[in-house]
UniProtKB/Swiss-Prot annotation:
Sorted UniProt keywords: Acetylation, Cytoplasm, Guanine-nucleotide releasing factor, Nucleus, Phosphoprotein, Proto-oncogene
Nucleotidyltransferase keyword on record: no
Composition bias type Polar residues, residue spans: 133-146
Chain positions with Phosphoserine modification: 21, 100, 106, 122, 508
Membrane-spanning parts: none
Domain PH: 386-501
Function comment: Acts as a guanine nucleotide exchange factor (GEF) for RhoA GTPase. May be involved in activation of the SAPK/JNK pathway. Stimulates genotoxic stress-induced RHOB activity in breast cancer cells leading to their cell death.
More info: Can be converted to an oncogenic protein by N-terminal deletion that leads to nuclear export and cytoplasmic localization. Transformation seems to require the activity of multiple signaling pathways. The physiological conditions for cytoplasmic relocalization are not known yet.
Protein name: Neuroepithelial cell-transforming gene 1 protein
Subunit structure: Interacts with RHOA in its GTP- and GDP-bound states, and with CDC42 in its GTP-bound state. Interacts with the PDZ 1 domain of BAIAP1.
Gene3D superfamilies: Dbl homology (DH) domain (1.20.900.10), Pleckstrin-homology domain (PH domain)/Phosphotyrosine-binding domain (PTB) (2.30.29.30)
């Protein structure tokens, strides 16, 4: 009896479970791929489903099989998952966390994915120290550079007709170039003065960023100088021929240059104006406004102070421009004598402006001095009209001091702040220049912190140091000062030496007899401090003292001690400087260079 067909198809449910477990990868063996049946329908329904919770793993569950992908997906990397845009209320992870994405792609056999991971790591390492917000902000700024407004730099010869150019000599072309440079500079100056008023002064006044009084103090009378330079430009224009040449300009300059004395008040106020502007820059509104102007094309990447300082920089160029015109002017030309006169006029104007500016600067710093003791007040400070030099130095303890050298007195101060106002607190007793002694010290003679050489073994030794002190140590202390570098030390040395020189020349001829020239070595005459103190002050020539050790090549290698000073005071006064020098050479203690 033949079995029934239904009995032969009983194992099919087991085959169906295997097909389901294999996620319909391959058709059943022995059956065509398009064979319809209930198993095929169930397989299609499972493929369309989104959940695998209905599948129960069986003994034939195979984890080694992979889902087949299309070939075009092998090299495709979706960038949508790397969207950097996040909600505003969501915490943004640092950019360094993106490295985990690159590390997850391992092992990497595909070249495109490997290159992508390297790219992620490369820009992650470059941006580890910044947040994504700051990175995007800096990128947005750099992608839109502000175009800078540039001025024409064409030469006069470039605008000249070819036939006209051939008819002029090389010297005459250079002379016309110099005259054109003078005229072009006046035009640029007028534009800058108008720009300072239109782009800075008026908007800040209208927006109430600064008060009218503050703006007047900073800008001064810039509007009053515009007609002055327009007048020179008009005169040069009238003297210009149709072919573009100027035959004579000397008489124009002789008549016009004295009007530059109007800048005395403006230049004298520059120091106070700069200080007020720096103070107002602490205001966020002022800072934001100036920054926006700086990023605008009209500013040419120049800040406000650059525009305010343009008149001063223009003044110092006039002698150079006039000398350049004179250099290319023939000796038999009528302009030669007039140009020489014009050069003398502008030099006199600049001297007057510098003198007025120096007095104003001197008074500005005098008003900022703060005294801790009434004994520190010296009438020579208030009477000072010239500030020879000033700047920051360090004392032997490493503290920063601000030094002022007036024409008659040296003042050491410490910068302080009182009610948001910068002042200079007078430190110790000021030293009059006529009683000032300057000592040059070699590098390593003094250790910063107050210890002398050798006191603390192999420690850092001070460099670029010198000492200032009283001739008579009783009124005050000596000060060991340190400059930032050799250049600044030499500047201070030259400045103090220049201040001392007039008092050396004021000595009597008898006392100066036998004195060597500058930079030569001699011994200071030191009478006793008891009965002949007045004679000592009249005989001692204040100056630069270089202390030597048995050799003139090792100037400044030793330090004057208290014991040496007492021994010198104990000596009897000699009638002449020659005998004092002979005695010092016989003793072999030290040598001093006095200026």
């Amino acid at each position: 009896m033949e079995p029934e067909p239904a009995a032969q198809k009983q194992p099919r449910p087991r085959r169906r479970s295997r097909r389901v477990s294999m996620l319909s990868e391959e058709p059943a063996a022995g059956l065509p791929a398009d064979t319809p049946g209930p198993a095929a329908n169930e397989r299609c329904s499972l493929r369309r489903g989104s959940s695998f919770t209905f599948l129960t793993p069986g003994p034939h569950w195979d984890f080694t099989l992979k889902r087949k992908r299309r070939e075009k997906d092998d090299d495709a990397v979706s960038l949508s998952s790397l969207d950097l845009k996040e909600p505003s209320n969501k915490r943004v992870r640092p950019l360094a966390r993106v490295t985990s994405l690159a590390n997850l792609i391992s092992p990497v056999r595909n070249g495109a994915v490997r290159r992508f991971g390297q790219t992620i790591q490369s820009f992650t390492l470059r941006g580890d120290h910044r947040s994504p917000a700051s990175a995007q902000k800096s990128f947005s700024r750099s992608t839109v550079p502000t175009p800078t407004k540039r001025r024409s730099s064409a030469l006069w010869s470039e605008m000249l007709d070819i036939n006209m150019k051939e008819s002029l000599t090389t010297r005459e072309i250079k002379r016309q170039e110099a005259i054109y440079e003078l005229s072009r500079g006046e035009q640029d100056l007028i534009e800058d003065l108008k720009l300072a008023r239109k782009a800075y002064h008026d908007p800040m006044l209208k927006l109430s960023i600064m008060s009218e009084e503050e703006l007047t103090h900073i800008f001064g009378d810039l509007d009053a100088y515009i007609p002055l330079h327009e007048d020179l430009l008009a005169r040069i224009g009238e003297a210009t021929k149709p072919d573009g040449t100027v035959e004579q300009i000397g008489h124009i300059l002789v008549n016009w240059l004295p009007g530059l004395n109007a800048y005395r008040g403006y230049c004298s106020n520059q120091l106070a104006a700069k200080a007020l502007l720096d103070q107002k820059k602490q205001d966020p509104r002022v800072q934001d406004f100036l920054q926006r102007c700086l990023e605008s094309p009209f500013s040419r990447k120049l800040d406000l102070w650059s525009f305010l300082d343009i008149p001063r920089s223009r003044l110092v160029k006039y002698p150079l421009l006039l000398k350049e015109i004179l250099r290319h002017t023939p000796k038999d030309h009528r302009d030669v004598q007039l140009l020489e006169e014009a050069i003398l006029i502008i030099q006199g104007v600049l001297s007057d402006i510098n003198l007025k500016k120096g007095e104003s600067e001197c008074q500005y710093y005098i008003n900022k001095l703060e005294y801790l003791d009434e004994k520190q007040k010296d009438p020579r400070i208030e009477a000072s009209k010239v500030l020879l030099c000033h700047g920051e130095l360090k004392n032997k303890s490493g503290h920063k001091l601000y030094i002022f050298l007036f024409q008659d007195i040296l003042v050491l101060t410490r910068p302080v702040t009182r009610n948001e106002r910068h002042l200079y607190q007078v430190y110790r007793q000021p030293i009059p220049v006529q009683e000032l002694v300057l000592e040059d010290l070699q590098d390593g003679d003094v250790r910063m912190g107050g210890s002398f050489r050798g006191a603390f073994g192999n420690s850092d030794k001070a460099k670029n140091i010198f000492r200032v002190r009283f001739q008579d140590p009783s009124p005050g202390h000596s000060h060991t000062l340190q400059a930032n570098d050799v250049f600044h030390k030499q500047q201070w040395f030259n400045c103090i030496r220049a201040a001392i020189a007039p008092f050396q020349r004021a000595a009597s001829p008898l006392e100066l007899q036998g004195l060597p020239d500058l930079h030569e070595e001699c011994e200071e005459n030191n009478p006793s401090a008891g009965n002949l103190r007045a004679q000592r002050r009249s005989c001692v020539v204040p100056g630069v003292m270089q202390i030597d050790e048995e050799s003139a090549l090792d100037c400044g290698s030793s330090v004057q001690t208290v014991e040496d000073t007492r021994n010198m005071k104990a000596q009897r006064p000699q009638p002449g400087l020659r005998r004092a020098r002979d005695k010092a050479q016989s003793g072999g203690k030290k040598k001093e260079t006095l200026v």
